[in-house]
C-alpha cells in the first residue's frame, strides 16, 4: 500500500467529508482494532466512467436480470456484510467506528448502497460516498455468482445518468482492472478530484 498513512485520534462525519475532498480516506488495521488511520496512496485507483468495460458474458447476465437491484435500501446490512470475514477475505479493515461514521454519512445523504436481492435475501452489494460530482467506492460483497459485479454495473449506469465525473476505487485490483480501472498518480488525481469538488453536490 504505497502512500502516506497517518493516525487520527478522532473523526467526525464532517472531518471525514473534508478528508475525502482533499484525497484522504480512512482505514483500520482490522475489524477489532479501534484505531483509524488516513490513507493517501501514491497511485490512486480510478474507474473512468466513459471507459467502463463490460464483458459480453457479464452483459448477457445483466440483461437476464437475475437479481432485483435496489439503491439505499439496507445500508446497515450492506456495510455489515462487507465487514464479514470470509474464506476469500480472512480479515477486514471495517471496524465499529467506521461502520458508525458511514451510517451517519448515510443519514446525511452522502453514503449510498447498490444492492442485489434474491427475493427477501440480500445477496450482494457495495457502498461508497458521494461528494460533489465524485463517488468514492468503499467495499463490496457477494453471496451469489456475479452479484457484486452486477451492482457495479448499475452503479456506473447511475453515476453516468446523474452527471458524476469521478469514480474513485481507492486502489486497483485485477478484478477492477477487468472493468477498466486504472492507476492515477497522486498529482493527476488531485486535479481530477479538485474538478469534481467544484461541482455542486449531485443527487445519487
From Swiss-Prot:
Enzyme class, broadest EC rank: transferase
GO biological process terms on file: protein catabolic process
GO cellular component: a single term: cytoplasm
One GO MF term: leucyl-tRNA--protein transferase activity
One Pfam family per UniProt: Leu_Phe_trans
Keywords tagged on the record: Acyltransferase, Cytoplasm, Transferase
Entry function: Functions in the N-end rule pathway of protein degradation where it conjugates Leu, Phe and, less efficiently, Met from aminoacyl-tRNAs to the N-termini of proteins containing an N-terminal arginine or lysine.
Family: Belongs to the L/F-transferase family.
Protein's UniProt name: Leucyl/phenylalanyl-tRNA--protein transferase
UniProt organism field: Rhizobium leguminosarum bv. trifolii (strain WSM2304)
